[in-house]
A protein has these predicted regions:
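HhH-family (HhH-GPD) DNA N-glycosylase catalytic core used in base-excision repair
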Residues: 1-283
C-alpha cells in the first residue's frame, strides 16, 4: 500500500489493507456515516475527513492530512500482520481474508473513554445517536458538524440528568462522574506510561468502566495491542472455534496468551468476521 499526503488530503494507491467499510464498521468507531454515493465521512474530535473511492485506490479528503495519516495508522505494514495471523488457525485465516481492509484507528483517548462507556449493553445505532446528541449539545460547531466536547464541557453540566435527557439512560451518571474525575485530576497521560495490566486497573477506577470497556479503551485509545476485548460475539468465536472449557471471564486471557502482541488485531478480524457473517447468513 502507498499513502501520500497532499495539501487537501491523502492519496491511497494499491490499498490492499485499507477498506473504509472494514475499518469503520468493525465496531471501533461511532462517529462516521456514509453518503448516498457510498463515500464515508469520519469525525474525530473537531477533525473531519471524507473517503472517496478512486480508480486505483482511495482519496481521503481533509484539511488535516497529518492528523488522519496518523489516525488511520498508515505507517504500519498490515500485510505482515495479516500473514502472521493467517498462519495460526484456519478460522483466523478466513477472518483475515474477510476483513483484510481493517486498520485499527489511533483515536483520541478521552473520546474513547466516553464512547465506550456509552457503548455498554447498547447497539451501534443508539450509541451513535447518543454521542451525536452530546456533541450537538456541548461540542463546538464546525463547518462539517459538531466537535466532540472537551472534558471541561462534559463536566460543567449541572447533573447527570442532562445526559439522561440525551438518551444515555443508566449510563448518564457514569458520563457525569467520569467527566468530573478526569477534570479533577485523573491522570490520563500517566496511562500511556503504564503497562497494560496497570493501565487496565487504573481505568477500572472510572465509573462505568468494566473489563470489556477498559480493554476497548486501551485498544482504540491507547493502541495497546496486547489486549483482547470480549463481548457476546467474541464469546461465540471462542465457543465455536476455540472451545477449551474455560469460563467466560477467562476467555480474554486465553486469546492474549494465544496471540500475544497481535491480540488486538486478531480480535478485530474475528469480531468483524463472525458478526458480519452471522448476521448475513451461514459461514
Amino acid at each position: 500500500m502507498k499513502a501520500q499526503k497532499t495539501e487537501n488530503g491523502i492519496t491511497m494507491l494499491q490499498a490492499d489493507c485499507f477498506n473504509p467499510r472494514d475499518i469503520l464498521e468493525c465496531g471501533q468507531i461511532f462517529r462516521f456515516d456514509r453518503d448516498g454515493e457510498g463515500n464515508y465521512r469520519v469525525f474525530s474530535l473537531d477533525k473531519y475527513a471524507e473517503i472517496k473511492k478512486t480508480n486505483d485506490g482511495y482519496f481521503i479528503s481533509t484539511d488535516s492530512p497529518d492528523y488522519f495519516y496518523d489516525f488511520f495508522d498508515l505507517d504500519r505494514d498490515y500485510g505482515v500482520i495479516c500473514e502472521k495471523l493467517s498462519s495460526s488457525y484456519d478460522v483466523m485465516k478466513r477472518a483475515v481474508e474477510f476483513g483484510r481492509g481493517i486498520r485499527i484507528l489511533r483515536q483520541n483517548l478521552e473520546e474513547m473513554i466516553f464512547s465506550f462507556i456509552i457503548s455498554a449493553n447498547n447497539n451501534i445505532k443508539r450509541i451513535q445517536l447518543i454521542i451525536g446528541r452530546i456533541c450537538e449539545a456541548l461540542g463546538e460547531k464546525t463547518p462539517f458538524g459538531y466537535a466532540f466536547p472537551s472534558v471541561k464541557k462534559l463536566a460543567e453540566v449541572s447533573s447527570p440528568d442532562f445526559y439522561f435527557r440525551l438518551g444515555a439512560g443508566y449510563r448518564a451518571p457514569y458520563i457525569y462522574e467520569t467527566a468530573n474525575a478526569l477534570k479533577e485530576g485523573f491522570e490520563l497521560d500517566r496511562l500511556k506510561e503504564l503497562d497494560s495490566v496497570k493501565a487496565r486497573k487504573a481505568l477500572l477506577d472510572l465509573k462505568g468502566v468494566g473489563a470489556k470497556v477498559a480493554d476497548c479503551i486501551m485498544l482504540f485509545g491507547l493502541n495497546r495491542f496486547d489486549v483482547f476485548p470480549v463481548d457476546t460475539w467474541v464469546k461465540k468465536v471462542y465457543h465455536r472455534y476455540f472451545e477449551t472449557g474455560l469460563k467466560d471471564s477467562e476467555i480474554s486471557t486465553f486469546f492474549v496468551d494465544t496471540f500475544g502482541d497481535l491480540s488486538g488485531f486478531a480480535q478485530q478480524y474475528l469480531f468483524y468476521f463472525l458478526r458480519t457473517m452471522d448476521k448475513g447468513g451461514k459461514m
